[in-house]
Amino acid sequence: AEWGGGWGGHSNPDYGRIVTLGTDHLREIISENSKKYPDEAWFYRSCSNILDALDIFGKRYGEEALKQAENCDNTEDKELLVRMAKAFEAVPKKPAYDFTSAICSFMLIFALDGSDSPGRFDQYMYPAYLKTENKGEVKELLGRLWEYFHDHRSWNLCISGSDENWNDESNELTYLILDMVKKTGYNTPNLTCRIHKN
């Protein structure tokens, strides 16, 4: 699902579905819905085509990451490229298994869709954050992501908020993002913090 106009920067793709479910699971949903709604078969075919493109894009990114890792002299960069190549063996077809793989899935959609709003980043990335043993990797990746956002205009990133019963949905990732914004001083992406009565 996507909200917004047909111009860059004013839409919010549902990154969370790809990050948490993967394209294989989304294909199952598409298949079920195309049987339920045969008059909309053209729409579901186009959805499948987009998922195919995303998978091809991911495969190419994985190959490129491995190629760059082989020629990289910087130890830190080489380790990241190897982690990315490993991640792209799974994502976007499968759900993200840690923060590196979640960032890889996110970036595929972000690049393919044309640098739109990251949306409620701390919410859909949090499950992957919890699966990541080395939280230092999360900070490193957030730092690199914020540099990317700064160099390639992105629009609105939303944090915090509540559920339908006013339970606070802030989490550790919410505060890491706030720290990153404070540390970098960048105004891209625009940061929206949802405040609620509790």
Predicted segment positions?
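Conserved catalytic cores of very large enzyme subunits
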Residues: 1-47, 76, 80-88, 94-198
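Extended non-globular scaffold/tether segments
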Residues: 45-56
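Extended amphipathic alpha-helical scaffold segments
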Residues: 61-66, 126
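Short, Lys/Glu-rich amphipathic helical modules
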Residues: 65-81
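Hydrophobic faces of stable alpha-helices that mediate helix-helix packing
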Residues: 55-62, 122
